[in-house]
Amino acid sequence: MITHFRQAIEETLPWLSSFGADPAGGMTRLLYSPEWLETQQQFKKRMAASGLETRFDEVGNLYGRLNGTEYPQEVVLSGSHIDTVVNGGNLDGQFGALAAWLAIDWLKTQYGAPLRTVEVVAMAEEEGSRFPYVFWGSKNIFGLANPDDVRNICDAKGNSFVDAMKACGFTLPNAPLTPRQDIKAFVELHIEQGCVLESNGQSIGVVNAIVGQRRYTVTLNGKSNHAGTTPMGYRRDTVYAFSRICHQSVEKAKKMGDPLVLTFGKVEPRPNTVNVVPGKTTFTIDCRHTDAAVLRDFTQQLENDMRAICDEMDIGIDIDLWMDEEPVPMNKELVATLTELCEREKLNYRVMHSGAGHDAQIFAPRVPTCMIFIPSINGISHNPAERTNITDLAEGVKTLALMLYQLAWQK
């Protein structure tokens, strides 16, 4: 079984990774880009050739379906997102979709049609890398995405969401999509994107919860002025204000300790030239924790601290909290089933939380959901150096296949 999956991965992963590959290494496959469209179209053809019924929904989520014989109206769904970050790796997201297809294809060959319908899903978007919106794919599955929230947004190059969508053959709906009611379970395989499994020599992670996270875009408004003729005491320097905010906040996060994490990931000073005091600086904040109350309290204090620093320095501040996701537990019964499977197969595993957000957190409050983690070499992800040992990749697909067998092929 491992040998089969290893060979299948060695053949299909480079193929799927060729769509959106950067010449200098890594991958860039942003929502509704030509690379994104080519990937979805080619994956659709490959799944159809293997005997699955394929279709796109209204926003570009791709499905490959194998109908059940006794409970065709009950769907066991598996997959992940197909988009990437800019210059990312070839495992985050897409390997979960690929693994679902490989697992279902093997199960079909070994056992024939399932009792319950099984579907592969390659979700349109999760990362928020092109447009300021996340989980567009999974939110649309449950009618949670409001078209008005994306109708007027643009990417960094000024391309509108609506136009990008049209260029790929899709039309923005006028209202939220009708939620799917037929999904009875969702299983997502994903790389850990951290170093816990590798550090402990373990090949499988059974995820019991996903951290909550808050993301901000903050804009500081001071005054641009001549760098040589403006004395230090007369400046309204937004980069200096940012540096104070960053240092103070990171030190507080360090004192708080795990599992809290805080990141200032994007900084844009203006006018961004050597001889002008920066009068405007925009930056992002990403904060995560497994406890909703701790996350809320820490970020509220962070907002208060930022305002206090800006008041002291006569700097205007605009704080936009554009993502607020609470921690999400996985389904206890599915976690128990997956844990029992790992024990039965004598897998080297651990039960753990996810420090990253995943599509599973959109599914979990609505349908029974679980996640399987596989190790990330050196804990690296969102990076061209993102890697997982081929044996661990195959072990992950095997574990997924066994889980899907229990959910869809057994009563």
Locate predicted features.
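N-terminal capping segment at the start of a domain
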Residues: 2-33, 124, 382
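Zn-dependent metallopeptidase/amidohydrolase metal-coordination segment
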Residues: 9, 15, 22, 79-80, ...
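A non-catalytic alpha/beta surface segment that caps or lines the substrate-entry region
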Residues: 21-67
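A short beta-alpha structural unit
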Residues: 29-32, 263-272, 284-290, 316-335, ...
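His/Asp/Glu-rich mid-to-C-terminal helical/loop segments that flank catalytic regions of hydrolases
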Residues: 38, 210, 226, 230-256, ...
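Active-site metal-coordination/substrate-binding segment of hydrolases
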Residues: 44-48, 53, 63-164, 395
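Alpha-helical metal-binding/catalytic segments enriched in His/Glu/Asp
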Residues: 78, 88-127, 214-220, 226-252, ...
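Midchain, well-structured core segments that form catalytic/ion-binding scaffolds
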Residues: 125-126, 130-292
